[in-house]
Swiss-Prot record:
Keyword RNA-binding belongs to the record: no
GO cellular component: plasma membrane
A single MF term (Gene Ontology): aspartic-type endopeptidase activity
Subcellular location: Cell membrane
Reactions catalysed according to its record: Release of signal peptides from bacterial membrane prolipoproteins. Hydrolyzes -Xaa-Yaa-Zaa-|-(S,diacylglyceryl)Cys-, in which Xaa is hydrophobic (preferably Leu), and Yaa (Ala or Ser) and Zaa (Gly or Ala) have small, neutral side chains
Descriptive protein name: Lipoprotein signal peptidase
Annotated S-S bridges: none
Amino acid sequence: MKKRLFVLSLILLVALDQLSKFWIVSHIALGEVKPFIPGIVSLTYLQNNGAAFSILQDQQWFFVAITVLVIGYAIYYLATHPHLNIWKQLALLLIISGGIGNFIDRLRLAYVIDMVHLDFVDFAIFNVADSYLTVGVILLVICLWKEEDYGD
């Protein structure tokens, strides 16, 4: 993926995350639940003082430090490995985008705005950036696993 496309994709993904959070805050009261796809997904507004899926509540200094380290390392890795396959680039793009999206909330608000509730399973409320991070990490693990198995 060319550097320009990577940067534009990063900006777009972070913007989508921030716009989704802005929309939730503007249209749903704190703690209110509104069905989006009845029985499947509801939207709610939650202020999360923890990490993805509400773990490690009230440890902001820890999350800021970890976020800076992970994003910094991902950018360093991209810069020093210019010929990564598209899947690793996509994984790192999602991880960086998700990290930046939640980092903006932490710096601006001291909490992260969460809004997606899966009605069909007992699961934490999460946001778009959490989704980026989750998919990015899963994709990276698959890439690394494939490398180990096949030497790619």
